[in-house]
């Protein structure tokens, strides 16, 4: 009897393998993975969560690629989309999960977190005295702990670059409206100031409304503030750049191993074709913000002021699954008009060093001194009209360097802000 059961089990395994080899081809990596999944499902001694097995397998594959290819569950996907559309009740931050830690990309202007002094680059390590860092907590669980009804309090522990002790903040949750143009006004007669916090579904319309109102008041020149702008929708960025460039000027192009070169060019019908333009950036300006900055710099349409931007220039295609979950897969790189790749270097599968890049820049003094930035001659490029030297190698290098203001938040200010 025992021998008979062994033969039956072996036959069942062989049947699974034969079926998949017929459908997928003998020796195919996909066949190997599906044989393993089917074997676990049908032969494993205990019950298993098949959905979790598949999700973990997808995450494992993506971890071996670039730092920005990612998978999100249906609930996580919905939560991420809310940061660009609609409104919600919470603490008012946009964040990524970086090596099991919540890294704040930016705070919502006038939102609960900004009001108490939380900043881009902070890492939230605990919520209401419960650790959320280093415990492999899902994004969904973290979001659930941070969000809550308007008016309720939440206590968070924050690790900030350059500060040894964990900072404690008490935040009163509030309704978070999503307006991506944070501020606009005449900074002096004839000079407009517009700050864009992120590039969402309504950013272009918000920007145009602000620009036209300021032009009616006499604005001819513009300061465009993209500091701490973590990016967003490509089309919003392209539409805004179109307002500054002449007809057929190249804005950005993409190219990948399996994708042909795709160019985005200006139509020449913009509302800001003349007048001086200054773009403000810092180390947290990324993705769509870098596309805008790189186009204006390379086309000699304006001057870039600040510090080297983040360096996120990967084109990601969202691949939606039937259950509402999503995989964002990198398919190409973004290049500025002069040919500079916006993406900073990375080693596939080595996210740990990639995630330390900003910390390393800080330690090397790059945030405080332009002399701390060393670039090879091979990274030199030329702007398209005036043939000025600009640099590649990841991120956008400003034309004029402005050091980080180390006096922005004193120890006393942090203590007061943490206590609301």
Where are these regions (language model features)?
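Bacterial Sec-dependent N-terminal signal peptides
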Residues: 1-26
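Cleft-lining beta-strand/loop regions that shape enzyme active-site pockets
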Residues: 18-29, 33, 37-50, 73, ...
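An acidic helix/loop motif centered on a single conserved Asp/Glu
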Residues: 48-65
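PDZ/PDZ-like peptide-tail recognition elements
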Residues: 56, 68-106
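Structural motif
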Residues: 121-123
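Hydrophobic beta-strand signal
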Residues: 125-126, 303, 328, 343, ...
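Extended catalytic-interface subdomain
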Residues: 317, 329-347
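Conserved functional hotspot residues or short segments at active or partner-binding sites
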Residues: 341-420
